[in-house]
Amino acid sequence: MAGLSHPEGMLRPDDFVAIKANWLPKDKNIVDTAEELNILSEAFVFVDDNPAEREIVSGQLGGTAVPEIGEVTDYIRVLDRSGYFETVTLSEDDLKRNDMYRANAQRAKAQSRFADYHDYLLSLEMTAEIGDFSPLYLQRITQLTNKSNQFNLTTKRYTAEQMEAVYNSDEYIRLYGKLYDKFGDNGVVAVTIGKTDSEDKGRLDIELWLMSCRVLKRDMELAMLDSLVAQAKKRGIREIYGHYYPTAKNKMVAGLYESFGFEKISQDEEGNTAWRLLVEGYEDKNTVIKVKEEHYA
């Protein structure tokens, strides 16, 4: 830590979202930090001049990037050419990422003070902004479709052009979700795209449902479902169909539609499932987030 306080140094402790300066195994520190920030260990790049430490982390955390940095004179060159920190697009949410990670650490600390999880959620004083797609957020929405893997039921990816086409089409019910709480703004964290059936006007098929890992377990998915059903009712939709396509990373949402009250109507040999929800009689499920709807009449 002393090195970060050197008067001629460029970095300060506040430049880091988390600092682990202890004698614990480094793979354990990576796992602990990932849990604190609510991200995957696959999001980390581990840089160490000790080959033994690099081998341990590589063996314990297969998804963590561990570059072979070699000689001291090669450090900057290896990291610069690795591509780990390249980005094709930079959204407004990206610029706030460090602040968002710090806020997540504060939430984790606050949660430890509650025995009842529902009470903890209420204490966050959450407000969601949910509405139709806006040009202001299209870049972030497209980015999410190509990054989110855990809470992503179909893992369908979209290019900017494809998302623009969805935005300009009347065939779709489109929802983005932003989540705020007393610790800060989480940004755009949820996306749902449902396509109406040209032959059966009472049917809506969910083509995409995803949520950023930074807001998992905060009931944002319930708020999104309530808003989706509300918009479906306005369109005269009677049935909403959802699909789950399993991948190595999205097992956490395998039972999502069932938990929402959807009826399973099919399953193939690969585990792909289809689900149906009758809109009539649906009761709102969100009880902890105040929702402010935007851009919908």
Locations of regions flagged by a protein language model:
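Conserved Lys-Pro-Asp/Glu-containing loop-to-beta segment of HAD-superfamily phosphomonoesterases
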Residues: 30-51, 57
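A conserved beta-strand-loop-helix scaffold within acyl/acetyltransferase catalytic domains
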Residues: 129-214
